[in-house]
């Protein structure tokens, strides 16, 4: 197999993420499903009043089997396999995917109404999701926490209870981005100002309780810093950049306290990604120097002759988590593009991508490329043969499609690699929503602009970047602590009210975000480290 260019790799990962998000969010039923009929005018490509596949998610559950079950009444993932826990970060990442993809689908206006209608659908659905989160995924003190649905019927009725009293700063940080991104993607929406204020209120919480973040695990702090870097990419907020600088400086010392290369390869790779992004935004040299040190150490794990990288283990069979693989490859891509500005690691990236992502079984299936009569297949959406994009920009030919396998295109939770046999295996195919939406969002966020430029969709169009770098340095000084509670009144007459689904747990609807966070921190301080010490929050 010939070497793939980084442009092809990035294009394939963006395309996979775009299509996988659409499949999971609209067809899996793996979560609480919004009212379907209200989307009838928004999604014109199918008759959703009779199509049993269409099931837009208000929230996504923690785990499920990704195999589609077909019955007379409904199609989707097997409901018996659902682990009906609802994690805030996972759901924020799901909404962020929809919001980022609005830019792509908006380009089809007046060209292909079927594809363009997805833009309108995602805008409406993401609004419904964010409204649902603020009303149902917070505890009595107003902090986002893990919830569990204790009722069997997930389509018509639900009852959410707190999974436990613990909370994660990373859950709050990804929610912060989601509410802010909606506000700048949809500035004319009446609710956008309240969402923006709510987001900045979460940022203020991080400033006020920065010392408590220091008590968290390295993995948890890295996720908070990642969120802050993404947030800063949308808003050059002075509080955000100060937090990025302080927390990144802190984790450099924390990283050196033990050998994370042995214990937590995924955390080490995430640490490297975070260092690179923090350097990109702050230009603090120690961040670049430490990132270079880590990337050089990660490179020593790579065996060029066998085209593999090995976790530091004496075992003949090595278990790789999904994040071990995706973060390892992404660390080199991000470092190469933001510090080296060269293709020094081109061979490593291409080799490991083909072996560990394409050929290992890590991906269950891969969406078919756009057909030859599809506007998405052509640069400038022209349908001209001279503008046709090669299939390798969307997928590799040797990986089965969802149509062939009956399985949604997802990342498996983990795979095993036998060093002696140089072969992969996995015992069970499982959809882990956190791992998947984390990967999907990173690929969409990092590669969307490059993908759209390759298709000549933003050649002279600045709309995709106009949302970013909106300097609101003074926003964090004037916060409305009732901003989210006001959303119920402001949106009372909206035709897209997710609370129209019966809800038996509305105790947090009117809670300001940080009403009593001091009490929460005191109550959970003894187990906060225990909560965050796991690199897998699920």
Annotate each language-model stretch with its function.
Residues 1-538:
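Glycan-recognition and catalytic cores of secretory/periplasmic carbohydrate-active enzymes
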């Amino acid at each position: 197999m010939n070497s793939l260019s980084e442009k092809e790799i990035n294009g394939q990962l963006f395309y996979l993420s775009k299509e996988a998000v659409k499949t999971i969010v609209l067809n899996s039923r793996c979560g609480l499903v919004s009212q379907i009929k209200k989307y009838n005018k928004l999604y014109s490509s199918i008759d959703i009043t009779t199509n049993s596949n269409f099931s837009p998610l208000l929230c996504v559950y923690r785990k499920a089997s990704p195999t589609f079950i077909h019955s007379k009444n409904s199609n989707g993932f097997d409901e018996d396999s659902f682990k009906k826990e609802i994690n805030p970060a996972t759901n924020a990442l799901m909404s962020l995917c929809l919001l980022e993809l609005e830019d792509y689908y908006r380009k089809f206006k007046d060209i292909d109404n079927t594809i363009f209608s997805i833009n309108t659908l995602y805008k409406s659905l993401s609004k419904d999701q964010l409204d649902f989160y603020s009303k149902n995924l917070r505890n009595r003190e107003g902090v986002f926490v893990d919830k569990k649905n204790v009722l069997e019927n997930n389509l018509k009725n639900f009852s959410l209870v707190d999974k436990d009293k613990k909370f994660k700063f990373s859950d709050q940080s990804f929610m912060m981005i989601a509410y802010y991104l909606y506000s700048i993607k949809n500035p004319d929406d009446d609710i956008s100002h309240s969402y923006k204020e709510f987001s900045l209120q979460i940022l203020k919480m991080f400033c006020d309780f920065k010392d408590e973040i220091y008590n968290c695990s390295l993995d948890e702090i890295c996720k908070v810093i990642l969120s802050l870097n993404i947030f800063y990419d949308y808003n050059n907020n002075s509080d955000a950049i100060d937090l990025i600088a302080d927390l990144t400086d802190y984790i450099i010392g924390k990283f050196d306290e033990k050998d994370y290369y042995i214990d937590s390869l995924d955390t080490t790779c995430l640490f490297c990604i975070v260092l690179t992004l923090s350097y990109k935004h702050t230009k603090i040299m120690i961040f670049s120097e430490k990132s270079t040190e880590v990337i050089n150490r990660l490179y020593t794990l790579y065996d060029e002759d066998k085209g593999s990288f090995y976790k530091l283990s004496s075992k003949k069979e090595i278990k790789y988590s999904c994040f071990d693989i995706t973060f390892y490859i992404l660390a080199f891509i991000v470092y190469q593009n933001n510090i080296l500005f060269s293709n020094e690691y081109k061979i490593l990236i291409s080799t490991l991508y083909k072996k560990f992502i394409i050929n290992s079984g890590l991906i269950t299936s891969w969406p078919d490329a756009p057909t030859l009569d599809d506007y998405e297949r052509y640069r400038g959406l022209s349908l001209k043969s001279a503008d046709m994009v090669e299939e390798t920009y969307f997928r590799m030919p040797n990986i089965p499609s969802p149509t062939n396998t009956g399985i949604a295109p997802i990342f498996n939770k983990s795979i095993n690699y036998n060093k002696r046999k140089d072969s992969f295996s996995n015992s069970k195919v499982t959809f882990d929503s956190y791992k998947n939406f984390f990967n999907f969002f990173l690929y969409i966020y990092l590669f969307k602009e490059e993908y759209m430029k390759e298709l000549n969709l933003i050649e002279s169009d600045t709309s995709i970047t106009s949302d970013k770098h909106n300097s609101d340095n003074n926003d964090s000084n004037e916060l409305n602590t009732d901003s989210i509670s006001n959303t119920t009144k402001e949106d009372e007459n909206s035709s897209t009210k997710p609370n129209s689904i019966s809800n038996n747990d509305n105790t947090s609807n009117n809670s300001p975000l940080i009403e009593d966070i001091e009490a929460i921190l005191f109550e959970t301080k003894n187990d906060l480290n225990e909560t965050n010490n796991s690199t897998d929050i699920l």
